[in-house]
Amino acid sequence: MFGNLFDHVEYQTHEVVFDKNHKVNLNISKAATTELHLTGQVLWPASYLFCYFALKNKALFKDKNVMELGAGVGLVGLLVSQLGVKRMIMTDGEDDIVSLLEKNRILAQDTFVKDGNIKDAVLSVKQLWWGVEGEIEKCLGPKDNCDIVIGADILANALGDPRLPLQCAKDILMYNRTDRVKKQFVCAYRSRSELNREYIRDVAKDLGFTLQIVPPSSFLPAEIPSTHTIDEDMLLCIFELRP
């Protein structure tokens, strides 16, 4: 899948430090852009919000099978993979972004070994196009399932209707579902307007989700590095599918 797409692309290594026990090293393209097909090369602010939520709620992810939608450079998935998950699958669509994501997965595993802190989680990268038949089956085996879907800045963006990622998250959570345990889609995003928030609530309800909005004040630390951009209009949402 990944071929030689790295050969003519320049990257710079960026270290994101949350505390003494949790950091993520990332390769980021020097030509990072906001063009729609390459937005995954950018470190989006909601990723930082999600990471702080995850660090405050480690028990939510422990021993869980997790899949990330729109993983981009991989900050969220690579941080969550350090929190005791059973399996982490990071996904994105465009070839260039999937290649960069794979590059960062390899860098993360090399870092784990060098630090003498090898993680137990099975960490992988898959290509996933939302709403395309057969895509989920390419990411999950015939006996696999997913407990939690995660994402950052994938609901309210220039790509339009949030129904697409919400429907994709539901389809993943329902894939091979045989238990009676609640399933969750946890997402951080920038709320563009009250109208946008209401529409997302309506779509979630229509798809069978219950929605909980978690106040950032309940999990953000007192001091945040200036490089970790977190804006007041960002939300952390838990969309839950009950048995």
Language model: regions and residue ranges:
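S-adenosylmethionine-dependent methyltransferases
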Residues: 1-243
